């Protein structure tokens, strides 16, 4: 009924929000690692 439709939407929205946040965290880690690697390559400290 109406409740199950609403519940499904709410769960889907939460899941999408969670996935986006996880993606952001992982993305930031990848970017940071990339910057670290680029920095050590420039300095020749790898």
Curated annotation (Swiss-Prot):
Q: Which GO terms describe its biological process?
A: defense response to bacterium
**Which Cys-Cys disulfides exist here?**
40-46
- Tissues and organs where the protein is expressed, per its UniProt entry: Expressed by the skin glands.
Subcellular location, in the record's words? Secreted
Q: Which domain of life is it from?
A: Eukaryota
In which broad location class does this protein mainly occur, judging by the first location in its UniProt entry? secreted
Q: Which UniProt keywords apply?
A: Amphibian defense peptide, Antibiotic, Antimicrobial, Disulfide bond, Secreted
**Keyword Secreted in record:** yes
Q: Which residues form the signal peptide?
A: none
Q: Which family does it belong to?
A: Belongs to the frog skin active peptide (FSAP) family. Esculentin subfamily.
Q: What does this protein do?
A: Has antibacterial activity against the Gram-positive bacterium S.aureus ATCC 25923 (MIC=12 uM) and the Gram-negative bacterium E.coli ATCC 25726 (MIC=12 uM).
What is this protein identified as?
Esculentin-1HSa
């Amino acid at each position: 009924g109406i409740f199950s439709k609403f519940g499904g939407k709410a769960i889907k929205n939460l899941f999408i929000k969670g996935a986006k946040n996880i993606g952001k965290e992982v993305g930031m880690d990848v970017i940071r690692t990339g910057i670290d690697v680029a920095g050590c390559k420039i300095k020749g400290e790898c």
